[in-house]
């Protein structure tokens, strides 16, 4: 079987290389003449693409960079929200020029410098809530970033395996064409000797045509696999010319662990659940804000000390502060006139308290009702997300079990093909079959081995998908020995 595999890969070399590297003109030649030109074409300038290189390239792909940028945007939004929640300093000034009475009075000028410092001090302040919203958004972005990276890694592993499988399939298809051509030559000789009917010869011709069509489709599959890998990586790639040049297929994974434990883990870290939980928290914050807006009066208290102005004079140097209970913002002010107010300004203390409470027609009750409905909808969305995650993990676990069953089936099929090959070789030694029958048995065994490789690779990808669904997969720890 190893001899046939080597022959199949050599036969498939020109076809696979034509799909993964720039085409080179070649004149028709006999099989014996086609071997020498293979040496220079088998020395490409680009290195053989390995899975480790693929995983390195995917970290520079557009999808990876886009996920990084989205997370960075969430970080900047949080920094901006925290900056808005800090101290705010405002400096201003005003100037006036007054003449009273207009006909006989003197021009009096005055200029005042003012400064104000304000900050949010109560927990329900809008700026504090903005920080909490930005923190939840960053948490969502972090979960989305991790999921995007894991998804890209799994896609890269799957695309690399698909390219390997397509290349192996193309080589086997070319080997099938060569075998069908030899069988047709024998059939023509038998027909010339009138040993078989014309219908048998036509069947051989049809078999060759079918093999050629299958080989063409296999070459197209190689091209599509290379294109899909290039689209994922965001750059052109050169695939290995033969399946043997790819990284080896990994061993079959173990059966999934306790599904309930995987579901429990997924419910804590899946981005869908984190996103829905954050939306519920946002809806709860809106509901609390609407409740406070309805129940708290618009209350503000202030104090001012310094050279307070009388009814006929201007104020002098003053300091003061105020607190708005509803907005949760406290502020301190200082006023410094550039002109001495004189005797009219006396040192004193002023206290103020303002309050207003809407009684009818404010619409705040409607806003609270709407916020309650939004909170209930968000709670339902969270429950739906949790159920979806539960179902997804259990489905991925079932898919892995199915893939492992197919590995066992492919292993049994390979054992049967190898037993048939051994029997056919023994029958050849006894003179009961022809060498073409042995070649057909060797090709069948090679196809069974390729089917086992494909089933094993599919089981490996299924295990990665389950690990992704249960949030156990770390994109930095994926085994590159594929």
Please place each PLM-identified region on the residue numbering.
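Gram-negative bacterial Sec-dependent N-terminal signal peptides
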Residues: 1-17
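Bacterial Sec-pathway N-terminal export signals of envelope proteins
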Residues: 16-90, 120-121, 237, 243-286, ...
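Small/polar, glycine/serine/threonine/aspartate-rich low-complexity segments that form flexible
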Residues: 38-47, 90-126, 130, 246-255, ...
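Amphipathic alpha-helical coiled-coil segments and their boundaries
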Residues: 53, 58-60, 67, 120, ...
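A glycine-/polar-enriched beta->alpha junction
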Residues: 56-65, 72-88, 115-133, 142-150, ...
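Heptad-repeat amphipathic alpha-helical coiled-coil interaction surface used
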Residues: 66, 71-73, 78-80, 131-133, ...
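Periplasmic alpha-helical coiled-coil/stalk elements that build and connect Gram-negative outer-membrane
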Residues: 148-269, 279, 399, 403-407, ...
């Amino acid at each position: 079987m190893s001899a046939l595999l080597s022959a199949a890969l050599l036969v498939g070399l020109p076809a696979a290389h034509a799909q993964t590297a720039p085409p080179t003109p070649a004149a028709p030649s006999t099989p014996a003449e086609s071997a020498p030109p293979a040496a220079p074409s088998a020395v490409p300038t680009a290195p053989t693409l390995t899975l480790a290189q693929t995983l390195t390239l995917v970290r520079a792909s557009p999808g990876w960079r886009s996920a990084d940028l989205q997370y960075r945007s969430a970080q900047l939004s949080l920094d901006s929200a925290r900056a808005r929640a800090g101290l705010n300093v405002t400096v201003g000034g005003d100037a006036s020029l007054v003449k009273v009475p207009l006909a006989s009075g003197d021009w009096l000028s005055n200029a005042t410098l003012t400064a104000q410092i304000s900050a949010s001090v109560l927990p329900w302040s809008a700026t504090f809530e903005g920080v909490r919203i930005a923190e939840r958004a960053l948490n969502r972005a972090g979960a989305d970033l991790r999921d995007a990276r894991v998804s890209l890694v799994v896609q890269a592993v799957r695309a690399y395996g698909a390219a390997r499988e397509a290349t192996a399939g193309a080589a086997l298809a070319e080997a099938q064409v060569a075998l069908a051509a030899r069988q047709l030559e024998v059939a023509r000789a038998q027909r010339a000797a009138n040993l078989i009917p014309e219908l048998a010869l036509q069947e051989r011709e049809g078999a060759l045509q079918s093999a050629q069509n299958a080989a063409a489709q296999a070459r197209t599959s190689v091209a599509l696999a290379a294109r899909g890998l290039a689209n994922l990586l965001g750059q052109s790639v050169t695939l290995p010319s033969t399946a043997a040049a790819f990284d080896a297929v990994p061993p079959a994974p173990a059966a999934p662990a306790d599904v309930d434990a995987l579901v429990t883990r997924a419910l804590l870290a899946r981005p869908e659940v984190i996103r829905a939980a954050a939306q519920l928290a946002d809806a709860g914050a809106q509901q609390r804000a609407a409740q406070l807006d309805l129940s708290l009066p618009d209350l503000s208290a202030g104090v001012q000390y310094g050279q307070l102005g009388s009814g006929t004079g201007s104020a002098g140097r003053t300091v003061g502060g105020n607190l708005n209970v509803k907005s949760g913002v406290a502020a301190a002010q200082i006023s410094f006139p550039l002109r001495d107010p004189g005797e009219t300004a006396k040192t004193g203390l002023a206290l103020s308290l303002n309050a207003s409470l809407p009684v009818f027609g404010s619409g705040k009750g409607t806003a609270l009702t709407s916020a309650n409905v939004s909170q209930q909808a968000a709670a339902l969305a969270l429950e739906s997300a949790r159920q979806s995650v539960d179902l997804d993990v259990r489905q991925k676990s079932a898919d892995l079990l199915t893939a492992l069953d197919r590995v066992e089936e492919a292993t049994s099929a390979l054992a049967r093909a190898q037993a048939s090959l051994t029997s056919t070789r023994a029958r050849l030694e006894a003179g009961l079959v022809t060498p073409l029958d042995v070649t057909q048995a060797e090709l069948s065994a090679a196809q069974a081995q390729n089917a086992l490789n494909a089933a094993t690779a599919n089981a490996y990808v299924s295990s990665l998908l389950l690990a992704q669904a249960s949030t156990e997969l770390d994109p930095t720890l994926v085994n590159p020995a594929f």
